[in-house]
C-alpha cells in the first residue's frame, strides 16, 4: 500500500493507519514532500522523501532531520528544473552520504529540463543515482487528471 497525494503526514491518523496495515501483513510506503517530521511513523514504513530543490522555490521547507531517519529501504527524490538544481542535489547527496544511506532518484521537471541532459550529467559525473521519469506526463496531455 502506497500513501501519497497531497501530504499524507497532515493526516493525524496516519501513524495508526500505517501500523494497522503493517500488522495485517501489508507492505506500506509513504511519499512525503519532506516538510513534516517522519519520526512518528513505524520504522517498517518505506519512506519516499521529496527533497525540494532551489528551482522549486520551496527549499526552505525541507525538514533536514528527516534525512537522518532514512534507511536502506527508503528513497529520496530530487525533482530538478535546471543545472543549478542538479549541482545542488549532487552536493546534498555527497554531504549526507545519501548513496550509501538509501535509494536516490533524480527526476527532470517535465518541459523544463530534458531527460537527456540530466542523463548526460549523471553519466559524466558517474553519479550512481537512478533517473526517474514522470512517465504519465509523456503519455497523456498536460493537466490530465487521474493518471
Where are the language model's segments positioned?
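Conserved AdoMet/S-adenosylmethionine-binding subsite of the radical SAM
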Residues: 9-147
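Short Fe-S-cluster ligation motifs
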Residues: 1-5
Amino acid at each position: 500500500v502506497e500513501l501519497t497525494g497531497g501530504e499524507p503526514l497532515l493526516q493525524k491518523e496516519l501513524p495508526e493507519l500505517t501500523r494497522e496495515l503493517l500488522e495485517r501483513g501489508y507492505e506500506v510506503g509513504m511519499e512525503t514532500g519532506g516538510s513534516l517530521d517522519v519520526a512518528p511513523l513505524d520504522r517498517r514504513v518505506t519512506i519516499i522523501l521529496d527533497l525540494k530543490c532551489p528551482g522549486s522555490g520551496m527549499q526552505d521547507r525541507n525538514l533536514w532531520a528527516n534525512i537522518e531517519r532514512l534507511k536502506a529501504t527508503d528513497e529520496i527524490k530530487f525533482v530538478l528544473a535546471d543545472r543549478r538544481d542538479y549541482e545542488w542535489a549532487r552536493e546534498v547527496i555527497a554531504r549526507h552520504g545519501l548513496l550509501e544511506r538509501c535509494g536516490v532518484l533524480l527526476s527532470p521537471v517535465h518541459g523544463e529540463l530534458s531527460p537527456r541532459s540530466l542523463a548526460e550529467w549523471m553519466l559524466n559525473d558517474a553519479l550512481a543515482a537512478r533517473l526517474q521519469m514522470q512517465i504519465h506526463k509523456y503519455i497523456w496531455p498536460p493537466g490530465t487528471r487521474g493518471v
